[in-house]
Amino acid sequence: MPPKVASKGAKKAASKAKAARSGEKKKKRRRRESYSIYIYKVLKQVHPDTGISSKAMSIMNSFVNDIFERIAAEASRLAHYNKRSTITSREIQTAVRLLLPGELAKHAVSEGTKAVTKYTSSK
């Protein structure tokens, strides 16, 4: 008869006890930053009864990161052209106008202006 194999829970408990005895530090888990919770909140505002798969969330997260990097790079370039060392909301606004097409840029600028106004009024 083969020997009994310990369950996963028992193995984890045994390894924790071993680590505690030998004075080893527990390996700290690295936090993964993403926009997932914010994407989910917006999805629920727009379509409350709709869900999103993890693969679709990963794609959306990549999209937000890509757009963020493009806007930051363009704003940095604009600040450099104008011999400025600070990226202000004006550079961000101009970068958005340059990167996004037509109506999308108008909506993005109006939403951005609204967000900045809300932030400054709450201070």
Swiss-Prot record:
Pfam families: Histone. GO terms for cellular component: nucleosome; nucleus. The keyword Chaperone does not apply. Its main location: nucleus. Keywords: Chromosome, DNA-binding, Glycoprotein, Isopeptide bond, Nucleosome core, Nucleus, Ubl conjugation. Monoubiquitination of Lys-118 gives a specific tag for epigenetic transcriptional activation and is also prerequisite for histone H3 'Lys-4' and 'Lys-79' methylation. InterPro entries: Histone-fold (IPR009072), Histone_H2A/H2B/H3 (IPR007125), Histone_H2B (IPR000558), HISTONE_H2B_site (IPR055333). It is found in: Nucleus; Chromosome. SMART domains: H2B (SM00427). CDD domains: HFD_H2B. Glycans are attached at residue 110. Residues 1-31 are annotated as: Disordered. GO terms for molecular function: DNA binding; protein heterodimerization activity; protein-containing complex binding; structural constituent of chromatin. There is a cross-link at residue 118 (Glycyl lysine isopeptide (Lys-Gly) (interchain with G-Cter in ubiquitin)). Residues 9-31 have a biased composition (Basic residues). Belongs to the histone H2B family. The nucleosome is a histone octamer containing two molecules each of H2A, H2B, H3 and H4 assembled in one H3-H4 heterotetramer and two H2A-H2B heterodimers. The octamer wraps approximately 147 bp of DNA. Core component of nucleosome. Nucleosomes wrap and compact DNA into chromatin, limiting DNA accessibility to the cellular machineries which require DNA as a template. Histones thereby play a central role in transcription regulation, DNA repair, DNA replication and chromosomal stability. DNA accessibility is regulated via a complex set of post-translational modifications of histones, also called histone code, and nucleosome remodeling. This is Histone H2B.
